[in-house]
């Protein structure tokens, strides 16, 4: 009975376990030093003290039985120095200065990177149509801080402004431009269209028919003014320009006849506007000729009147009665003749 009790007791089991276990110890150098711990009594005392005293207990330097010699705050924590404990405030100050310096350096680096990024974005972006010289090109725009709604509104307003600019018609001014090769004038609308072909190298322009005749004989277009050869030429209008690159030239004398037959069938106007313009020009020339004829007749009449008056003055030395009667009759006859001339000029 006693053997059964001894076999079932937990003490015998623990002893048998200790007999079969091998304990190994590491050297003292490899064993880490345990961190200092508060005793249970000190933990209870710390729990009974108020929150401020508990915070201060964790930042006590020196023996608490000695009087307090220094108190200071570092990183929102209060430190208390007791007695002549080895302590130097410069350590805390240097640590604080180093942290502030590192934080300032990091902030400076972030600002430099942000400025470089914004400067690259401004260089690659195309200028807006509503650019104003008041805004400096070095101005930093914080586009990254805009919300998607603000970006959409700015894009919408920009597109709306462009549509309004396109809707306003520009004043059309007809200009007569001279070709240096064929000596022909071409009437085009200024800043809207052009009948000339311009080289991409020297910007000298020729009419399209001269460009065609030149390209039939040469593979490259050679400017007639500066003798510079260029493979491509440009034709401009109000939307932009089209580059012309000749691919082949086919010699066919019947092709131009076929082309003109198509023009006469499809591109001729049925209105009589050219004839009306010719009639108006002829009427204006006729009115000018009539005005010149009337002025010439009036000059001739005035000259004849002056000659007759001079003759009458020479004859008026004979007798007073006879001279007076003769001058009256002659003056009346001359005045009547002058009025007839003026009436005839008015009728014309």
From Swiss-Prot:
Enzyme kind, highest EC tier: transferase
Biased composition (Low complexity): 316-333
Task of the protein: RING-finger E3 ubiquitin ligase that plays an important regulatory role during the initial stages of infection. Migrates to specific nuclear foci early in infection supposely to prepare the sites for viral replication by targeting and ubiquitinating host proteins.
Protein name: E3 ubiquitin-protein ligase IE2
EC number(s) from the headed UniProt entry: 2.3.2.27
Spans annotated as Disordered: 1-32, 312-333
InterPro entries: Znf_RING, Znf_RING_CS
Lineage: Viruses, Viruses incertae sedis, Naldaviricetes, Lefavirales, Baculoviridae
Biased composition range(s): Polar residues: 1-11
């Amino acid at each position: 009975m006693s053997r059964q009790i001894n076999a079932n007791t937990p003490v015998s089991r623990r002893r048998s376990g200790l007999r079969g276990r091998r304990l190994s110890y590491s050297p003292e150098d490899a064993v880490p030093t345990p961190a200092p711990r508060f005793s249970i009594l000190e933990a209870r005392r710390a729990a009974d003290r108020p929150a401020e005293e508990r915070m201060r207990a964790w930042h006590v330097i020196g023996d608490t039985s000695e009087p307090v010699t220094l108190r200071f705050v570092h990183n929102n924590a209060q430190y208390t120095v007791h007695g002549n404990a080895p302590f130097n405030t410069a350590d805390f100050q240097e640590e604080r200065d180093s942290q502030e310096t590192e934080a300032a350096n990091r902030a400076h680096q972030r600002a430099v990177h942000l400025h470089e990024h914004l400067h690259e974005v401004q260089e690659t972006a195309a200028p807006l149509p509503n650019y104003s010289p008041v805004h400096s090109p070095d101005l930093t725009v914080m586009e990254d801080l805009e919300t998607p709604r603000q970006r959409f509104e700015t894009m919408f307003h920009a597109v709306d402004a462009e549509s309004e600019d396109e809707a306003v018609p520009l004043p059309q001014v007809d200009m007569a431009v001279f070709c240096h090769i064929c000596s022909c004038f071409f009437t085009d609308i200024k800043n809207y269209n052009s009948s000339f072909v311009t080289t991409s190298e020297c910007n000298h322009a020729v009419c399209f028919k001269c460009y065609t005749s030149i390209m039939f004989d040469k593979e490259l277009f050679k400017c007639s003014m500066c003798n510079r050869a260029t493979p491509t030429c440009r034709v401009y209008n109000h939307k932009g320009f089209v580059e012309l690159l000749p691919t082949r030239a086919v010699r066919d004398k019947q092709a131009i006849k076929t082309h003109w037959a198509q023009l006469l069938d499809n591109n001729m106007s049925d209105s009589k506007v050219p004839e009306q313009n010719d009639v108006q020009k002829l009427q204006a020339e006729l009115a000018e000729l009539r005005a010149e004829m009337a002025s010439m007749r009036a000059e001739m009449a005035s000259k004849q009147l002056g000659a007759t008056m001079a003759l009458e003055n020479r004859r008026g030395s004979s007798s007073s009665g006879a001279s007076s009667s003769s001058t009256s009759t002659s003056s009346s006859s001359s005045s009547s003749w002058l009025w007839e001339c003026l009436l005839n000029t008015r009728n014309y």
